[in-house]
Structure formats: structure tokens, C-alpha cells
A protein has these predicted regions:
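C-type cytochrome heme-c attachment and multiheme electron-transfer modules
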Residues: 1-194
């Protein structure tokens, strides 16, 4: 396969990027949990170490029909879906998630009870994830009680083309062996979520 210019001229990104959105839970401001790649620590803190990351290479079809290997960031999203009255799968509305998770602007007591691992009556981002059947069943039961049929978690991964942070000269990839060897960039792994 031919390679896009960006493949050699964007060998690494020197900033964090979204890795995943977790809409199976809500933060207190009704947002999903977000995870970033390319940073050690909280991306909102100036003390976190930015490490950057190497984008994954995927096939891209240009408008002229040419297929090229090009750099992408992969973003994984997790979310609740349910079956509507016609049997069609639909995403659970934010309003319904808010109803399941909150009472009077705070986490509902049954949510705190099942998610609060350290028993301090608050939920940290590390606790606020569905990592047990008890947590999943609690949220599922609350969504079912709202009239949603067969609520369950799904996920999808979307590729986002990288066309910025172009380098030139000695910072671009100038060695064919970077891709043409047993540890090729083409077959490198990229973590999809935490």
C-alpha cells in the first residue's frame, strides 16, 4: 500500500488526545468519564507529564479513490442502549441516565452504595466505572424501571484522521525500516481504553 504524506511527516504527536468516552456512568456535571492517551496523570492538571503517542496507521481512501496508509487516533465510546417498541436499538437518552444516577443534584443513594468502594460517601473517578456485575445490574435495573427494554452496554471505536503537527526534515521518518521490519509501525498496538 502507498503511504500518505502524514504517515512519515506525523510520526508522533506531542500532546494528549482523547482515548475514550465512558457514557455508562455520569460525572456530577452529567459528563462521561474521559480518558486520554499521551499523558501521565490528569490532563487538566499542569503537573501531569505529557508523553505524546504514536498514531496508529490505517487505510484511508482519498476522494480520488487512492488508498493510502495514514495516521489516526482511535477513540472508543461506551454507552447504554435499549430496544424500543419496534425492536430497534436506541441509545439511552442523557435525561434517562441523569434520572438513574442522580437525586436532587447528587448521586442517588443506591448508586453511591454500589459504586463507593472506599465507603467515604463520595464517588471518585476511579470508583465511577462499571467494573462489576453489581454496578452494571444496579444501573440496568434503574433504566429498566424507567421503562427501557433490555438496557445493555455497547461500545464502538471510531478512527479520527490526524492531519496536524506535521514535521519535516530530520523529524520526519526517513528510514524505510521503521515500517518494513518485524516491529513495524503498521502492526503496532494502540490501547483503546482503560
Amino acid at each position: 500500500a502507498a503511504v500518505a504524506c502524514e504517515t512519515c511527516h506525523i510520526p508522533q504527536l506531542y500532546a494528549p488526545a482523547i482515548q475514550s468516552y465512558d457514557w455508562t456512568v455520569l460525572t456530577l456535571n452529567s459528563q462521561p468519564l474521559k480518558a486520554c492517551r499521551g499523558i501521565n496523570g490528569d490532563p487538566t492538571k499542569t503537573t501531569s507529564l505529557v508523553t505524546g503517542y504514536k498514531p496508529v496507521l490505517l487505510n484511508r481512501t482519498n476522494i480520488d479513490g487512492n488508498k493510502l496508509l495514514a495516521p489516526y487516533n482511535l477513540i472508543t465510546s461506551y454507552y447504554w442502549v435499549y430496544d424500543d417498541a419496534n425492536g430497534n436499538k436506541r441509545p439511552v437518552r442523557l435525561f434517562d441516565l441523569q434520572t438513574a444516577f442522580f437525586e436532587n443534584g447528587k448521586y442517588a443513594a443506591d448508586i453511591v452504595s454500589v459504586f463507593d468502594a472506599n465507603h467515604d460517601d463520595t464517588l471518585s473517578n476511579t470508583e465511577l466505572k462499571i467494573d462489576s456485575s453489581a454496578k452494571e445490574e444496579t444501573v440496568k435495573a434503574k433504566l429498566t424501571s424507567l421503562g427501557l427494554n433490555n438496557p445493555h452496554i455497547e461500545g464502538s471505536t471510531q478512527p479520527y484522521s490526524i492531519n496536524h503537527n506535521v514535521t519535516r526534515g530530520e523529524n520526519a521518518i526517513n528510514d524505510c525500516q521503521v515500517c518494513h521490519n518485524e516491529n513495524s509501525r503498521i502492526s503496532q498496538s494502540l490501547k483503546l481504553s482503560e
